[in-house]
Swiss-Prot record:
Gene: Tyk2
Catalytic activity from the UniProt record: L-tyrosyl-[protein] + ATP = O-phospho-L-tyrosyl-[protein] + ADP + H(+)
Protein's name according to its UniProt entry: Non-receptor tyrosine-protein kinase TYK2
Gene Ontology cellular-component annotations: cytoskeleton; cytosol; interleukin-12 receptor complex; interleukin-23 receptor complex; nucleus; plasma membrane
PROSITE patterns in the cross-refs: FERM_3 (PS50057), PROTEIN_KINASE_ATP (PS00107), PROTEIN_KINASE_DOM (PS50011), PROTEIN_KINASE_TYR (PS00109)
Domain spans labelled FERM: 33-430
Species per Swiss-Prot/TrEMBL record: Mus musculus
Annotated catalytic residues: D1020
Length: 1184
């Protein structure tokens, strides 16, 4: 692997370092491992450490060095070992053979730009703040500083070395302006370097400059450039630098300020700093509906079958990994690929230009010849990673997969360790993505229920719920110390976790034993120690601490070990307190044959009429609807709630609301709810081959285990998606798994969909819950929604996995209710499969303690380990054939479901994209031009597609691809399906508080700030074009009027005529057809007005302005509206709108464009306002 961080060496020999990182090395004793350091620690000493133990892991070496240098446990995971000779980073579990001479380098590998907060244009980076501080708008209160003092010092020394060894090189610059800028910045960096030395040694700056030449503090390429000048030029440069030093008085600067300025300038000067670029021999983005990247080739594949030949040859693509930008990739140019991407040079290519750091979705190039970067994912989107030899699969929660083939197995391990490290730092500190790079200490911690080095407020939050809780954690200050923490509740502080007084008892690690200080007994494992402590009490002085229950680490816990990068609204769980689903009219459905009974429901096959009158064909060969009504007919399943159970209709609707707000290819699609007289009907998709348990029983003894494991993987994928959203299915079992594709033919895989749970657990009687044993989790027998959690679904998954293994026969099915209940009471174990690996997996899922059950990410990771032929099947195609483009959609596979809405020139509809025509498609939103559009509109349509394909932001609707029809010469835009529709349609029908409206407004500003940063103006920002993904997340859509602002210009002048949303336009747009960035701010003000009026049609901008100007048409409307706005008339204050919010609207409606705030300015203002009104009832709002 080629890391962009150059190699490190001794500070004493920096002046002789080469640009490629190869420098003179200290003499290595024979049979010894030497690790070189950038900084030896506060005590000084030699900048290297030697090891002579027989066998060590890379993690053990890092821990030893961190202890020597003074790096604290929370920062340990930022560091790793680099092998200069092999040019790879070592994964933490790599076993080092110290019998051979070896030089390694201890470096900070995991880096997050703007961790110092000096650049307001980039996301703030900080560790998660203390519980209860999230509502603060002050970053200092919001989060914890990323680095400790030793890590900061080490990074500074590492950054100095990288700068002087040409992480950004003068040789890569071409224009005089770039060279001049580089020289000035380099001299400034040299000044900061000398300032730091002077402050640390306590000597005057001029004296330090006489002792150390500034040329020793600038890049190697700059030094060589200076040597080429004549003596007079060099002397003049020395004098200029010394005059600058004499004129400057650094008394107000501290060492810390100097170090921060140095690193912040280095980030700006060298965009590659802190990133890694990895050349790969082969890259594919796999969309699972087209090519299922599972790990069996066909149903007859055996574990011993060899995999396909791995691609070889020069690199074809390059992958970019950064802490703030996630994973991106681009193809390599031919000449670069032929050179192997300069693999012998640890820097790769360099650039002295100053582009922004790559962020999610940005297509950034460092040179005009370099292809743009394509965004793949952020680390928290990853579900699991599979590594086999040189091939890596990165699987996402939405089932997309990145397939990479690296140049060597060592590079593959290095790359996976990089992705895994960033995942643990940003998503889940107690989970690893891949066994092959699992940190040994983390594996031990998971096995023994040990928390990471949590700070006290997070410990207090975990111990607060009840008395008798305790936890075991790694110390926050000592790398080799474990601590048992208990809490004493202080009656004087009873309102929160801060009222707990913590007491810590160290646990000493001895060879093969653990000893709790103050207790003479030793234990072979922490599990044995926990078992012995159960029910005991610890006494310290006059205090007595009962130990009833040990708090174990949980998936995705928020703590100081998780690093936040700006606002992450999409991590908030869905709020299901308000029902939301599509209503199906009773005339649109036809009830057909009865399929059976569910819990309090009757299930029928049916037909759902969708589409317009020109689509009168019938899907899947079904007969047309009686009466001859036109439109396409879809086969559906009708789940009819028995009218006698009208008392649980709300629970029935809650199920429909849950399934309507989620979208995953392995979840059955819910079309909506129909009320037919006294009947309540859920209308869901029809899946061809029906329930899995019935099919398995029919095929008893004929289905191979590999087939079953693919099904298990797909089920775990769907449940992992729900777990990430903190949603509980509550009824995972074989009868609710529907088989869409059999996958028995060679080259195919099965495809399943998890159906809706039916009537929710909370509405079931105890008898019904007992009847569902063994799928019902033990904690759910008592009833109530408080017992429902994601661990409930894990128990159901374990029981279903047994059901799949046993050909559809579930355990305990022959027993009566009392026997089943007694089975749970006695905590008996369900029967296990004969495979030891499968037995271990099901045992973990079916533990009676919910906190001890693993996460679905863990299950997905471990399921891949059960299949030795990991890569077989994903590459069972001609290696010479080009990879299919996942952004190309074919019209024949698009099945229309219903219309979603219309814009000025286009129409948006919901489609199912089903290329295999077997019910495995995904729901997408497709936008097409209306008929009769002229060439001018078609040209604008192409521009909209080109704009949207370059954007990637959490508050902008995602581009999926295009569908071209060569016959009709038309292009359809395919986007993600946003289930809840536009704010214009949503707000009038739902009760939304002011704080939530302000959150929407803040998110709109964040999306628009990103759009403006990409040099686009929207020109059609309105509530109708803001889509609601869930009740905490909005996305901007409809870029039909968007324009790119030419470089160096402040506005775009529109010359074409067309239908325009004039009531949302600023005066300069109406009068001069000039569209500034500030023109979008005006439109935002009108959009904010719409939000505060709840999109009431009687108070719409169109209605209000029409009342003021009278009914007019065409240009007369524009003329009168312009005159009205120039007189200072504005939309009135909405009812119950706070004064400061209406004042903010009026700021957005300033006549002079330059007086309006920017979206960047609006974000913190709205965030502060949102926090102010969070939790307040309407009566306390400060209205005018």
């Amino acid at each position: 692997m080629v890391g962009t961080m150059p190699l490190c060496g001794r500070r004493a020999i920096l002046e002789d370092s080469k640009a490629d990182g190869t420098e003179a090395q200290p003499l290595v004793p024979t049979g010894c491992l030497m690790v070189l350091l950038h900084w030896p620690g506060p005590e000084g000493g030699e900048p290297w450490v030697t090891f002579s133990q027989t066998s060590l892991t890379a993690e053990e070496v890092c821990i030893h060095i961190a202890h020597k240098v003074g790096i604290t446990p929370p920062c340990l995971n930022l560091f790793a070992l680099y092998n200069a000779q092999a040019k790879v980073w070592l994964p933490p579990n790599h076993i080092l053979d110290t019998s051979q001479d070896m030089n390694l380098y201890f470096r900070m590998r995991f880096y997050f730009r703007n961790w110092h907060g000096m650049n307001p244009q980039e996301p703030a980076v900080y560790r998660c703040g203390f519980p209860g501080a999230e509502t603060s708008s002050d970053r200092a209160e919001q989060g914890v500083q990323l680095l400790d003092s030793a890590s900061f010092e080490y990074l500074f020394e590492q950054g100095k070395h990288e700068f002087m060894n040409d992480v950004v090189s003068l040789r890569d610059l071409s224009s005089e302006e770039e060279i001049h800028h580089f020289k000035n910045e380099s001299l400034g960096m040299a000044f900061l370097h000398l300032c730091h030395l002077a402050l640390s040694r306590g000597v005057p700056l001029e004296e330090m400059a006489r002792e150390i030449s500034f040329k020793n503090c600038i890049p190697h390429s700059f030094r060589q450039h200076i040597r080429q000048h004549n003596v007079l030029t060099r002397l003049r440069l020395h004098r200029v630098f010394r005059r600058f030093l004499r004129a400057f008085r650094p008394g107000h600067l501290s060492q810390q300020v100097v170090m921060v300025k140095y690193l912040a300038t280095l980030e700006r000067l060298a965009p590659r700093f802190g990133s890694e670029r990895i050349p790969v021999c082969h890259l594919e983005v796999l969309a699972q509906p087209e090519r299922d990247p599972c790990y069996i080739q066909n149903s007859g594949q055996t574990a011993g079958d060899p995999g396909p030949e791995l691609p070889s040859g020069p690199p074809t693509h390059e992958v970019l990994v950064t802490g703030t930008g996630g994973i991106q990739w681009h193809p390599l140019q031919t000449q670069e690929s032929e050179r192997g991407n300069s693999r012998g040079n640890p820097h790769g290519s360099r650039s002295g230009k100053k582009p922004k750091a790559p962020k999610a979705g940005e297509h950034l190039t460092e040179s005009p010849q370099e292809p743009p970067w394509t965004y793949f994912c952020d680390f928290q989107d990853i579900s699991h990673v599979v590594l086999k030899e040189r091939r890596v699969h990165i699987h996402l929660q939405d089932n997309k997969c990145l397939l990479l083939c690296l140049c060597s197995q060592a590079e593959a391990l290095s790359f996976v360790a990089l992705v895994d490290g960033y995942f643990r730092l940003t998503a889940d500190s107690s989970h690893y993505l891949c066994h092959e790079v699992a940190p040994p200490r983390l594996v031990t911690s998971i096995q023994n229920g040990i928390h990471g080095p949590l700070m006290d407020p997070f410990v207090q939050a975990k111990l607060w719920p009840e008395d008798g809780l305790y936890l075991i954690q790694w110390s926050t200050s000592h790398l080799h110390r474990l601590i048992l923490t208990v809490a004493h509740r202080n009656p004087a502080f009873s309102n929160g976790p801060r009222g707990l007084r913590l007491r810590k008892f160290p646990i000493t690690q001895q060879p093969g034993a653990f000893v709790l200080d103050g207790w003479g007994r030793s234990f072979a494992s922490l599990g044995d120690l926990r078992l012995a402590l159960q029910g005991c009490s610890l006494r310290a002085g006059d205090d007595c601490f009962p130990l009833h229950h040990c708090c174990l680490p949980r998936p995705r816990e928020i703590s100081n070990l998780v690093i936040m990068r700006g606002s992450r609204a999409h991590t908030r769980p869905l709020n299901l307190s308000q029902l939301s689903f599509h209503r199906v009219h009773q005339d649109e459905i036809t009830q057909l044959s009865h399929l059976g009974q569910g819990t309090r429901t009757n299930v029928y096959e049916g037909l759902l009429r969708v589409g317009g009158p020109d689509e009168g064909k019938v899907d899947n060969g079904c007969p047309p609807e009686p009466g001859g009504t036109s439109g396409q007919q879809l086969r559906v399943v009708l789940k009819v709630l028995d009218p006698s159970h009208h008392d649980i209709a709300l629970a029935f609707y809650e199920t429909a609301s849950l399934m309507s707000q989620v979208s995953h290819m392995h979840l059955a699609f819910l079309h909506g709810v129909c009320v037919r007289g006294s009947e309540n009907i859920i209308v869901t998709e029809f899946v061809e081959h029906g329930p899995l348990d019935v099919w398995l029983r029919r095929q008893r003894g004929q289905v191979p285990m590999t087939w079953k494991m693919v099904v298990a993987q797909q089920l775990a994928s769907a449940l992992s998606y729900l777990e990430d959203k903190n949603l509980v299915h509550g009824n995972v079992c074989g009868r609710n798994i529907l088989l869409a594709r059999l996958g028995l033919e060679e080259g195919t895989n099965p495809f399943i969909k998890l159906s809706d749970p039916g009537v929710g657990q909370g509405a079931l009687s105890r008898e019904e819950r007992v009847e569902r044993i063994p799928w019902t989790a033990p904690e759910c027998l008592s009833g109530g929604t408080s017992s429902l959690g994601t661990a409930t679904d894990m128990w159901g998954f374990g029981a279903t996995l047994l059901e799949i293994c046993f050909d559809g026969e579930a355990p305990l099915q022959g027993r009566g209710p009392s026997e089943k209940e007694r089975f749970y009471t006695k905590k008996h174990q369900l029967p296990e499969p004969s495979s030891p690996e499968l037995a271990t997996l099901t045992r973990q899922c079916l533990t009676y303690e919910p906190a001890q059950r693993p996460s679905f990410r863990t299950i997905l990771r471990d399921l891949t380990r059960l299949q030795p032929q990991n890569l077989v099947g994903t590459s069972a195609v001609n290696s010479d054939s080009p990879a299919s483009d996942p952004t190309v959609f074919h019209k024949r596979y698009l099945k229309k479901i219903r219309d979603l809405g219309e814009g000025h020139f286009g129409k948006v509809s919901l489609y199912c994209y089903d290329p295999t025509n077997d019910g495995t498609g995904e729901m997408v939103a497709v936008k097409a031009l209306k008929e009769g559009c002229g060439p001018q509109l078609r040209s604008g349509w192409q521009r909209e597609i080109e704009i949207l394909r370059t954007l990637y932001h959490e508050h902008i609707v995602k581009y999926k691809g295009c569908c071209e029809d060569q016959g009709e010469k038309s292009v359809q835009l395919v986007m993600e399906y946003v289930p809840l529709g536009s704010l214009r349609d949503y707000l009038p029908r739902h009760c939304v508080g002011l704080a939530q409206l302000l959150l929407f407004a803040q998110q709109i500003c964040e999306g628009m700030a990103y759009l403006h940063a990409q040099h686009y103006i929207h020109r059609d920002l309105a509530a109708r074009n803001v889509l609601l993904d869930n009740d905490r997340l909005v996305k901007i859509g409809d870029f039909g009027l968007a324009k790119a602002v030419p470089e160096g210009h402040e506005y775009y002048r529109v010359r074409e005529d067309g239908d325009s949303p004039v009531f949302w336009y600023a005066p300069e747009c109406l009068k001069e057809c000039k569209f500034y960035y500030a023109s979008d701010v005006w439109s935002f003000g009108v959009t904010l007005y719409e939000l505060l009026t709840y999109c009431d049609s009687n108070q719409s901008p169109h209605m209000k302005f029409t009342e003021l100007i009278g009914h007019t048409q065409g240009q007369m409307t524009v003329l009168r509206l312009t005159e009205l706005l120039e007189r200072g008339e504005r939309l009135p204050r909405p009812d119950r709108c706070p004064c400061e919010i209406y004042h903010l609207m009026k700021n957005c409606w300033e006549t002079e464009a330059s007086f309006r705030p920017t979206f960047q300015n609006l974000v913190p203002i709205l965030q502060t306002a949102q926090e102010k009104y969070q939790g307040q009832v309407p009566s306390v709002f400060s209205v005018c």
